[in-house]
Amino acid sequence: MSSAGIAALVGNEMDPLMAHEAALRGIDARKHRARQLTGRILKDADVVLVFGPEHVEWIANEYPEHLAKAVSLGQAARALQSRPRLASSSWRTLLDDVQALSVEPCEADEIKDPYRRGEGIAKCAAGRICADLDVLSAALSR
């Protein structure tokens, strides 16, 4: 698993507020550096977890051949929570499972970009990211 953004400040450290939130959750973000999402990254990925519709739109415009790999992190977590017994057994089948469960994306799935938006947004984003990844991790490690 790795991270890349659609408007990355390539090489920059994690936003200080998000780095603080990561540290509170036991994650050392000191080595994290921003990188731009590229066709190569998308080509090598089995699944691309996005935070909002703007990410899906960017992939559709820039690399439409990889659009089928994109799913909202919140949507995937909600799908796996809704039908835990039908949940995925691997990252490679995650997209098929979300589609099979017929869970459509919704506004509640979105994780707002916390960059330079203050402590409250950073805390909310970090909490959502961790909670959603916990759901995926638990479902995919069964």
Identify what each model region corresponds to.
Residues 1-142:
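Short polar/charged helix/loop
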